[in-house]
Amino acid sequence: MPNIPEPVVSRRGVLAGGAATAVVATSHASARTSDRPAADPAPVKVSFKVNGERHDLALDTRTTLLDALREHLHLTGTKKGCDHGQCGACTVLVDGVRINSCLSLAVMHEGDDVTTIEGLGTPDAPHPLQAAFVRHDGYQCGYCTPGQICSAKAMLDEIAAGWTSYVSDDVAGTPKLSEEEIRERMSGNVCRCGAYSNIVAAISEVAEAQA
């Protein structure tokens, strides 16, 4: 009977073989997984008011408030600009507080009261800020204007409530409206056409009329 040599197994060989087995097993598992179509998440019911009217929606949980307003309620006055919360074109009011609707999920607003540019005024009865923007030519292309006006409305309410800002002379006192205050408080709203001076003039006019 011939002598058959004992197999010699090195530590390096064992490790290499184990690694190869893991790769093969993983590739087979990935192949099986990739064959399965991804299921869409089940829609979730959410109810909130928009411009005084209650809406009941069934939405994908990933739907932003901005997309709910534009794509589901067809309120296209609120604009999608950067979609990253950097330009302010999508600004709306939620319970009176301004937010970037592109950064907020619609399902977070169960029971909330949302106000868009359509809810501030109408062509026949414009909001004072809307009328002032027209008088002072506070826009050029107009794309950012709905967000600018919603933000300005909330900003004037913040000053009336005594909220100070980074540029306020006395953070413990009552803020005084100035051009510097307006520019600071409106800094989250970008106007790519550069109509900032006219925007400030429009807001100042309304603030003085309300004083």
What is the predicted function of each stretch?
Residues 2-211:
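Signature of N-terminal electron-transfer/Fe-S-associated modules in redox systems
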